[in-house]
């Protein structure tokens, strides 16, 4: 089984948290709401990977003013690829508290939508199990 280290920014701006709705045809949690994130590439430092993933998934315009390592978790997940292939992967999630100076987001093809969500409204979203666990640990659910 392949192992991946995943960096995940829990991004907050003015009391709201950034959630992204996964594409229906790919990823570990197709069609569900999640915090963004992605894999660390060979030879890449953790913070470099985090900043790269944010640029790739959320656009160059989103300006982070704070990045603080927060917690980690792990799990075995089944990833679905755009071509329909599936793969079981052992994932180690490194989660960061982040603050953004703006809300300028341009999502890539991995997502179909995004929203800035106040903590009291998080219960109204179909959150994937990993995001739900993270938000509970943070005291937001």
Curated annotation (Swiss-Prot):
pH dependence (UniProt free text): Optimum pH is about 8.5.
Protein name stated in the entry: Nucleoside triphosphatase NudI
Any one annotated GO CC term: cytoplasm
Organism domain of life: Bacteria
E.C. numbers: 3.6.1.9, 3.6.1.12, 3.6.1.-, 3.6.1.23
Domain Nudix hydrolase residues, every copy: 1-141
The organism's taxonomic lineage, starting at the top: Bacteria, Pseudomonadati, Pseudomonadota, Gammaproteobacteria, Enterobacterales
Role of this protein: Catalyzes the hydrolysis of nucleoside triphosphates, with a preference for pyrimidine deoxynucleoside triphosphates (dUTP, dTTP and dCTP).
Keywords: Hydrolase, Magnesium
Short sequence motif Nudix box: positions: 38-59
Top-level EC class as recorded in UniProt: hydrolase
Family (UniProt): Belongs to the Nudix hydrolase family. NudI subfamily.
Organism the protein comes from: Escherichia coli (strain K12)
Reactions catalysed, as given in the entry: a ribonucleoside 5'-triphosphate + H2O = a ribonucleoside 5'-phosphate + diphosphate + H(+); a 2'-deoxyribonucleoside 5'-triphosphate + H2O = a 2'-deoxyribonucleoside 5'-phosphate + diphosphate + H(+); dUTP + H2O = dUMP + diphosphate + H(+); dTTP + H2O = dTMP + diphosphate + H(+)
Subunit composition and interactions: Monomer.
MF GO annotations: dCTP diphosphatase activity; dTTP diphosphatase activity; dUTP diphosphatase activity; hydrolase activity, acting on acid anhydrides, in phosphorus-containing anhydrides; magnesium ion binding
